[in-house]
């Protein structure tokens, strides 16, 4: 990347902004809270804190589902908010933008990400749509120009992308509909079955991130929820 460049990863669960020379300048939950179906109430981590707790007149949602934009209006509101918050401090106007997208999405779905940046007031110098496996490999300083194959596995919230790269390109890539949210569901169901105890999605994610392991361990964590036997 030459000159001023901004990289953006629009994940289902979180959104990350990278600026060359500075590193990650924003890492927030990809969540928006809408008041009375029309007004932005909160965005990012602040909106995530309201998830599963908001009153009926506030809708908290994830605009990205399975790697693609599911709600273009809320997504535009969210990205406009983040750009407004960052632009004064990070001078984002006139930069080249690199947008990481899954390999197995349509050209129309890729265009939606492109249009998000075009529709802001940042006057981007140029917008590049980069396939996520390539962005992942470059971010990990992997040399994908060699003739030997490089396997990259990107586990997201709703999907997992498995790719093999060689000679600077993607040889094979598959996007499967299993991600971190499926692990959260498994935790919720396991605790409900074994302990007759109900927890929410946020609590399940906390358990996963704090003591989650592919191996059996003796670690434990205290969480809050509702006992199905007593109702408390």
Language model regions located:
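Nucleotide/phosphate-binding catalytic cleft detector across ATP-hydrolyzing
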Residues: 1-155, 165-232
